[in-house]
Amino acid sequence: MAVIEVKVPDIGDYSDVPVIEVLVAVGDTVKKDQGLVTLESDKATLEVPSAAAGVIKELKVKLGDTLSEGAVIALLETADGAAAAPVAAPAEVPASKPPVAPSHRAPAEPPAPKPALASGKPADIECKMVVLGAGPGGYTAAFRAADLGLDTVLIERYASLGGVCLNVGCIPSKALLHAAAVIDEVAHAGDFGVDFGKPKITLDKLREYKEKVVGKLTGGLASMAKQRKVRTVTGVASFVSPNELEIVGADGKTQLLRFEHCIVAAGSQAVKLPNFPWDDKRVMDSTDALELQEIPKTLLVVGGGIIGLEMATVYSALGSKVTVVEFMDQLMPGADKDLVKPLADRLKKQGVEVHLKTKASEVKADKKGVTVTFEAATAGETPALAATTYDRVLVAVGRAPNGKKIGADKAGINVTERGFIPVDRQMRTNVPHIFAIGDIVGNPMLAHKATHEGKLAAEVAAGEKKEWVARVIPSVAYTNPEIAWVGVTETEAKAKGLKVGVAKFPWAASGRAIGIGRTEGFTKLIFDEETHRIIGGAIVGVHAGDLLAEIGLAIEMGAEAEDIGHTIHAHPTLSESVGMSAEVYDGTITDLYIPKKK
């Protein structure tokens, strides 16, 4: 018998990701690719699989631990001579395409399934390119493929294009967050002598406004699809063979589509915890919460990540008494703790209760409401919150990929135990003419990542010699204040032993921030101490997401502190805080007094 270490594989840009569930115990017999622990990032949950079959001899982790790539999860006793299986290399691409390295974001790749034979039936639809899913990544891929001359079909399960993001995600939530921000701003206008009185909320009109915003964007996409001669098909599609898809419409009728190239952009779905009564409409996921069925007097939000906190911001502004419970010891796990503090302080002032290291262990629904019993994250400790009855409960604990819901095995596509589809740096799956993009290929599950991946996949399919070259992917929480970061975080730098310099400019010293009464924020830049190039940055404050792009561009261009500081920023603006942070690092700042080190 041999004992091997099972380690955390490559999980992309994430580090210090908390363990929210241990799925095995010492003595358990596990199969290869069976899940061992579940990790929770800011927007998704990740299940780490076993690299081999065997018996768990020792667990090296417990609930609440934070893990990064390479961390040992368990000691596994395998059969004689057995060892952890190496990650399978992506299938070699055709001779006309240059071979590329596996993506650093791709999950571990299992053995490829044997594809099904072609159906032999006449096709209802034939095309050069089919894109499965019309979210931001999918419609971008379809439009780019059409622009490059490929006869393209775009399949979407919703009646309108845009996927989760436009229909029930990013866009409607930002419309509601704008309304929440206006309510909050009006509430503080009295501080400078302008009193609007208590706002009157007409829920029907607010819902109508949200739907109007969504309609403008989805309608625009439909128009652009027609202009590009992209054929759109509404229905749920699954593979029949490596070159065929079956599409089932809302009326139950099926169509067979035959293609030369395919881009899978089938996205993800909200994780639904098993101990919640999901048949009760008072228990909601993020999609339900965006419907604004009512403004509950009391709302429990389970999960203190980005999605949970954004919806807590909306409902608190609308008048709900909101309670947030988070399993970890900070809100928004994955972000640096200093970024979260201004938000936590403001939520407290607004009356939002936050309970960390707390788990919802039992949930029961009756006529009185939804009663939730809590447990402390640490065994044996008393929970900070007693059993309480709420009008509604929102569960926001991440999203799971849809890789196992599209019949990928019939096309011979590799899908991990968790449901991700591994890809290389050209977004190819192990089947050379099939690509995958967006949430379904791995974290972070962000629309702007999917958009860039979709464009790349379409260009490669059309014959262009390209691969993924972006260094960083930005993250934004549209809370109040907003929290935005890109590149290496302080937490990640510490975990990796990087020698970095950190420079902060407090918005309390910003004329613009003082003028608008929002001085709780700050701008932070992180530099490599050896090269003096910027490798990360973050902003906390109003419009932080809009301000972050300069930092991302600086990282992509390999800028030094001097480059940023010598760029003249308009005054007075919030954006000049980026330049001033660079001056703090460079030691040339005049808008702050920082004693020189002796």
What are these language model-derived features?
Residues 279-296, 388, 392-460, 552:
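FAD-site-proximal beta/loop scaffold in flavoenzymes
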Residues 130-132, 237, 256-267, 301-302, ...:
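Short hydrophobic core segments
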Residues 2-83, 153:
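Small cofactor-carrier domains centered on a conserved lysine used for covalent cofactor attachment
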Residues 1, 78-127, 378-381:
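Intrinsically disordered, low-complexity linker and terminal tail regions
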Residues 103-107, 120-121, 125-127, 143-150, ...:
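Glycine-rich flavin
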Residues 121-137, 295-307:
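Beta1/beta-strand and adjacent pyrophosphate-binding region of the FAD-binding site
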Residues 142, 146, 312, 316-317:
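Gly/Ala-rich phosphate-binding loop of Rossmann-like dinucleotide-binding domains
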